[in-house]
Design a protein with these regions (language model features):
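N-terminal export leaders
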Residues: 5-9
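A short, structured surface patch at a secondary-structure boundary
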Residues: 58-64, 68-155, 161-167
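Conserved small/polar residues in nucleotide/adenosyl-binding loops
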Residues: 269-276
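Extracytoplasmic substrate-binding proteins
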Residues: 95, 152, 156-251
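Short, structured coil segments at secondary-structure junctions
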Residues: 112, 181-182, 267
């Protein structure tokens, strides 16, 4: 007998799928089970922090929402006495439902495409050939956009994490439903970083999540080094105006503090948009 989506959802025991919420102020966890070691060094990123604890535990805190995620090594002991707002992510973090498209390129640089099971974008919507191929080969499945995920498909595959961007905040009921089903939701904020290197530094967050910190630091260091020759050049004295056209043929200009404006500023040109 076929059942409807609503009937399917009602069959899932809510008690087994309950997930603690997020919302406390960003502080290193103060429990008897966790011993604080040090703050993970970030040179540019302002939208997340990482606190390291003895035993390989790492607490990730996302700015604004103050959502906290404790990354626990695969064979590490359970942690007792955690604050109620902390979401535990035990490694390996796999079968990810990836909605935030900007994250995919970072995962590719970490050789972590196999950690993604579901995409919020169809194959034809990707500009990354490796992702298109993975979807065409059935290694990554389309599971619906951010506002309409295929809950049955995601649950059946044992999804361990949904990575969303702030668009999900327009449909909070979807985030709540995913969390109700026991799927942690990480709302990444890399797009709120004003510095290009700060955006790139988010690769360290995914390195921590996936147990690839060293690789993430190597990738970031290489990109930072590649930018240095540009930063050491003298200003060109040239001016630049940047705009784009929407699908409605309207011209839009970025703010002077915008990420794109900052990229142009890094190249030492003067922005016409600076005064807007």
């Amino acid at each position: 007998m076929k059942i409807t989506r609503n009937q399917f959802l009602k069959l899932i025991p809510a008690a087994a799928l309950t997930l603690t919420g997020c919302g406390s102020k960003a502080q290193p966890a103060n429990t008897e089970s966790l011993v604080f070691s040090h703050h993970y060094k970030l040179d540019y990123a302002q939208q997340f922090t990482a606190d390291c604890y003895e035993g390989g535990y790492t607490m990730l805190t996302i700015a604004e929402s103050d959502a906290r995620f404790l990354v626990v090594p695969e064979d590490a002991a359970e942690v007792d006495g955690l604050p109620a707002d902390v979401t535990v992510l035990r490694q390996p973090v796999e079968n990810i439902y990836l909605v935030s498209t900007s994250v995919m390129d970072l995962l590719l640089h970490l050789d972590a495409l196999d950690s993604v099971a579901f995409s919020g974008t169809k194959a034809e919507g990707w500009y990354l050939p490796a992702v298109q191929q993975a979807m065409e080969e059935g290694k990554i499945a389309y599971a619906g956009k951010y506002s309409a995920p295929d809950y049955e498909q995601i649950l059946a595959a044992g999804c361990r994490l949904a990575i969303e961007n702030t668009m999900i905040l327009h449909t909070p009921e979807v985030k709540e439903q995913l969390e109700h089903f026991g799927i942690p939701v990480l709302v990444e904020r890399s797009s709120y970083e004003s510095d290009p290197l700060a955006r790139m530094e988010w690769i360290k967050l995914y390195g921590i999540l996936l147990g690839r910190e060293e690789q993430a630091e190597q990738v970031f260091s290489a990109q930072e080094t590649a930018v240095q020759p540009i930063l050491s050049q003298e200003p060109t004295g040239k001016s630049c105006a940047f705009f784009s056209l929407t699908t409605n043929n309207l011209a839009t200009v970025r703010k002077g503090s915008d990420y794109v404006a900052r990229m142009i500023a890094v190249s030492y040109t003067h922005l016409r948009a600076h005064e807007t």
